[in-house]
């Protein structure tokens, strides 16, 4: 399962350890049946048959609906992937669920309701918060790319926009070009 979250932050890149801003969209792609599950606030009608959209009234409903889906044994993944999920998506999501819904709900990220916080240092000795989710392996594409994509040569940046251009010849969606994700979640099908 691939996961990506969008956060309502106009103040730059949000810090996952504080999880100060609301989660406004969660997208998961089930790699077995190729179905995209998207939770968002606001009206949206998918234009593809393999997209299921869950319209939520507010962030609490969005998080609860996502957790109910994720924790269901038929949906709970063995492996979760994504870009920078180890140091952003997963910690932000767990911290935000804890802040909005409490510790017990955050534990629903694990099929055994057991998550463990870890603090790890990056190559610059900065401390980063991450979580081990019992029962689910995490494969972060950004980390894998840094370790194994040497055929692309040394990169000036490992941000998604740069790496998408290097590998695919395309840039990440621009907020300026497509509008704000705070107003509309209709971008989700385009970015999937």
Range-by-range predicted roles:
Residues 60-64, 91, 158, 190:
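Generic alpha-helical secondary structure signal
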Residues 47, 72, 102, 174, ...:
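Serine/threonine-rich low-complexity intrinsically disordered regions
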Residues 23-33, 79-184:
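Metal-dependent phosphoesterase core characteristic of DEDDh/y 3'-5' exonuclease domains
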Residues 48-53, 178-191:
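Inter-lobe coupling/hinge region of RecA-like P-loop helicase motors
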Residues 1-79:
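Conserved RNase H-like, two-metal-ion catalytic cores of nucleic-acid enzymes
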């Amino acid at each position: 399962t691939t996961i990506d979250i969008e956060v309502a932050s106009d103040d730059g890149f949000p810090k996952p350890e504080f999880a100060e801003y609301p989660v406004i969209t969660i997208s998961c792609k089930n790699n077995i049946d190729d179905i995209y599950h998207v939770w968002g606030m606001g009206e949206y009608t998918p234009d593809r048959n393999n997209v299921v959209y869950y319209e939520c009234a507010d962030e609490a409903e969005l998080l609860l609906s996502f957790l109910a889906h994720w924790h269901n044994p038929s949906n709970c993944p063995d492996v979760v992937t994504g870009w920078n999920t180890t140091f952003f998506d997963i910690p932000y999501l767990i911290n935000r669920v804890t802040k909005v819904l409490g510790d017990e709900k955050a534990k629903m990220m694990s099929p055994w309701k057991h998550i463990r916080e870890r603090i790890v240092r990056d190559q610059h000795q900065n401390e980063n918060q991450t979580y081990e989710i019992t029962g689910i392996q995490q494969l972060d594409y950004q980390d894998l790319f840094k370790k194994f994509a040497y055929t692309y040569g040394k990169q000036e940046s490992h941000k998604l926009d740069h790496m998408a251009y290097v590998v695919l010849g395309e840039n990440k969606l621009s907020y300026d070009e497509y509008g704000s994700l705070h107003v509309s979640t209709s971008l989700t099908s385009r970015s999937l």
